Structures are given as C-alpha cells and as structure tokens.
Amino acid sequence: MNENKEFKPYIPAEKVTAEMTVTSVIMGVILAIVFGAANAYLGLRVGMTVSASIPAAVISMGVIRVIMKKNSILESNLVQTIGSAGESLAAGAIFTMPALFLWAEEGLCDKPSLVEITLIALCGGVLGVLFMVPLRNALIVKEHATLLYPEGTACADVLLAGEEGGANASTVFSGMGLAAVFKFVVDGLKVIPADVSAAFTSLKGEIGMEVYPALLGVGYIVGPRVASFMFVGSIVGWLVIIPMICLFGPDTWLYPADPGVTISQLYAAGGAAAIWSKYVKYIGAGAIATGGIISLIKSMPLIISTFRDSMKSMKGGSVKGTARTDRDLPMNFILIGIVAMVVIIWAVPAIPVNPLGALLIVIFGFFFATVSSRMVGMIGSSNNPVSGMAIATLLISTIVIKSSGQTGIDGMKAAIAIGSVICIIAAIAGDTSQDLKTGYLLGATPKTQQIGELIGVVASGLAIGGVLYLLDAAWGYGGAEVPAPQAGLMKMIVEGIMGGNLPWALVFIGVFLAIGMEILRIPVMPFAIGLYLPIYLNATIMIGGVVRMFMDGRKNVDEKTKNDQVTDGTLYCAGMIAREGLVGIALAILAVAGISLDVSGVVNFGNIGGVVLMIIMILTLLKFSLWKKKKA
C-alpha cells in the first residue's frame, strides 16, 4: 500500500538519537521485574492482569525527561518495551504453572524446581519474540492502516505527550505510595480486616468486600461493564447456588467434600466460603473452560483468516532496506534461536517434555504467535483469547500425550509444561506486536526493540520462579489469598482427560450456565471468573467500576477534561496495582521468614474500619483524577 510506504514516523529514519542506553536498559529491567512480579500477584488473586506499557512509559518519561533532564522519546520507548515484557511473561506463566504446585500439595509429585520454572518461562518468552519478528513487516508495516494495535497506539500517544510526563509520573507514584500504606495497614499490621462481610443466616448466603487498593484499581481500569458481569457471577454463586445447595441437600454428602461430611456440617464449620470452596469453584471452572472455548470458536474465522493473511504477507517478503526503521534481527539469528529453544525444551531433563511435546510446541507456538500478533492489532491485548488458546493446546496435547502412552502424573506434568510454553508464547507475541507498533509510530529501530523484548523476557523469566515459589511458601495456591483460578482450571482439564476423578456434574452445571450467558449475549469470561472467585473480591472490583461509571457519565464537563481526568485515574490505579503487588510479595517474604507485624490483638478497628478505609481509598482516587489540579 502506498499510504504505508509514505508513512513518516515522529523521528525520521535518517535521524539517529539515543535509544538503547545504560539508563534505558537498567530502568527497563527494573520495571520488567516490578511489573512482572506485581502482575503475577494480581493475576493469581483475581485471574487477570493489566497492561504495563502505559505506566512504564509514563514512569520512564517522567524520570528521563524531568529528573535526568534528557529529551529522548526513543529511550523512553525502549524502557516501556523492556518493562512491558515482564507483565506479559507473568500473565502467561501464572495461568498454567501453579498447577504443578497444586499437584505437589496433593502429594502426586515434587514441586517444580526453580530451574524448571525459569527454563519454561525463558523458552516460551524467547520463542514468543522470535516467532513474531518475521511477521513485523507484514503486520506492522504493510498493514499499518488496517491493524490499529490500540494499546500500542495509545502508548505512542502518551510518549508523544511527553511534556506532561512529570505530572503524569507523579500520579503513578502517588498511587504506588498510598497503596503501600493501605496494603501495609490491612495485611501487615492487620489493624483493619482484609474483608468486610455480612452473612444472611436464613438464606445461607454471604456478601462482603475486600479492602484492597489493587481490586479497586482493577475495577476502575476494566470499567463498569466488565466489573458488573464479574459481580453478577459472584451473586449467582454466593446468593443463588450456595443457598440452593444448602436448602435442597442439608443432610447429603456430595463429592468432593470429605467422606461423611454433610452439606449442613460443612456450612456449620466454614460458612458459605466452605460450600464455595468444595462445590461452587468447580461450577466456576466449568464456566471458565466453556468461556474460553466459546471465545476461541467465535474467533476461529478471524484466526483462520489471520493466519492465512499473515502467511501471504510473509511470502511477499520484506525488503531488506538499509533504513534504520526497517532493520530487524537477522533471520539466521532467529532460526538458530528457535532451534536452540526447542532443543533445550526437548533435551534438558528439568523440563518434562519429550520430542513429541517439543514438536507440539513448535506447531502450536508458531500458529498461536501468528494469531496473537494479528488479533491484538484488531481487538487489542485485553480481548486476546490467550486463555482459550491455552485451553485448546491443553486439550489437544493432553490427548496426544495420553495416546502416546505417557499417562499418570508424568503425562499431566508434560501437558502443563507444553501449555505453559504456548501460553507465554502467545502473550509475549502479542506484547511484542504492540511495542513494535509504538516504535513504528515513533520511529524506533525495530532491531533495538526486539533486543529489548529479549532483555525484558530474560529479566522477568529469571525472577518469575522466585515469585511463584515465594507466594506458594507464604500462602499456598488455591486458597483465599492466591486462588490461581486459571491454573486450577488447567489442572482440572488435564486431570479430566487423563482419567482423574472430577465432580463432572458440577463442572457441567458451569458449562451450561456459560452457554446460557452466551445465548443472553452476556460476556461469558467475566461472568465465569466472577462465579469462580470469592464474592468479596469481585464486590471491590465492582466498586471501582462504579467510580469509573461516575467519571465517564458526567454531562457537565467537556470531553477533553473528562478524558484527561479518566486517564489520570487510570494511571493512579496502575500505580496502586503495581505497588500492592510488590508489598504483597514483601509480606510474603516476611511470612516465610516467620516475621509477624500483626498488632490486631492490641488495635483492631473491625468492619467499621474497613468501610472507612474503602471510603478513603475512593476519595484518594478522586483526588488524583477528578480533583487533580492541572498546571497552567
């Protein structure tokens, strides 16, 4: 297309400016680890992660422009390129790998070693970048006018508005600072309860909220629509299904409860939470699996056309121009890198994958990297059905592995390892595409960005194993603190195919609930996640969504002012999410070390304190968005 060939980036190709410097690499690595760790914690708690590109861009612009008095937009862009890789790798890893810890907890196997987790993360991340590089010319350049890459374009807009970098960065840092205080008060000192709840004794239901800044921030960022669907899922679970179970079968024993323990005894011992843990979670898991499959089926025409169009574009070849903005990593480096990763996956004993598994990774990896890279350009990273791709991979790979004679826990571990690598490949390929779109608009050097992506992958890949081990040691997966919803689902799928005992009746209730939601045109995944996770958690997300609805719905404010205020709120919430994750990890370190800061025995403000703290958190969000003073 001529319009694409005539596109002029912000920094012309002939102009050479600072890009990969010691400053940009160090800052990028720090942000990759920070956002990777924070998103790992968030994803294991609520089943979703948030994009790190814009917060990383704002922080880098604020530090480089305002503090260091430098003026290099491409340097800031490389920081966010490296930094955002951490979030994407964490998203891929946490959806699958905690399943290995869950099996270890059940005594079926040993916990995965740090070497195993690190190698799986690194191989998946590196393959995600390398599989995407040959697609850059086809997707980013040739289809510049067609594929918008929403997050990549938005990130470029933020960097281009760099004169506000200092003010915007201060908003992110304010969110980080206040979230640290809130989190420390609740989970460190424990002077305010983590959740405020009210039980409906006659109904046998329960409602409440968790007093956490990150959940409020997630609700604000995803908006009222998604937050409300999640909350509806929780209402169905906690105020409809749990009361029905208690009403119709109080004296019944129902698998998977402990033998002989009736439903009424279970409720008497643990309340609605005990019924949710034993029964409703399986209904939610069935709904999540169905939601992922429905998402994949609905996307199938787009997936097929995406893969076909990408292959056609690649056949056209990329012109080996000498322009700085047209330089990619050399193809021989890419091919050698891909072969090296596949050999490591196959040959290293720490990764439980045989040659057949390595072949499946190559086939599914390249296919889903291609699909992910193009789909995020059309519908954005937030709507990219990575979980659906992971479910499809697990279904097929588990069937193939079982058919080859590899059964039992060894076969299940191999299936999860394959699913982990594919999930990370898809997440990283999508992130790389968004970052390269940002670079294309700004005039960055693709090769430099691709190296930056690899640096971010290595940095976060080396850290993710420690984060997963730490959270497991502190609280264990599958509980209230880190429920790890997607990993629990992947575990259930593999066990079901391999012949494990599952409460299939409960799972199929979730399946048909999800199908009903789809018929009603209610987005299945938010509803299913709400059904799977505790109502306290989703209620707080709903509160954040209501705040966003108020911000979006004001009629007496001009659109520019409203958009600026909403964006300030998003940046503040991104800071809260990042910092709560880091404080959570710090508290996990203290828990493992046996150090307690708990003073609740001396000072405890009870439920009233929780309500007051939630009001304070809402007011601080409004302070840095609605009531933020702009510089003249």
Kindly give the residue locations of the regions a language model identified.
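Alpha-helical multipass membrane-protein architecture
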Residues: M1-A632
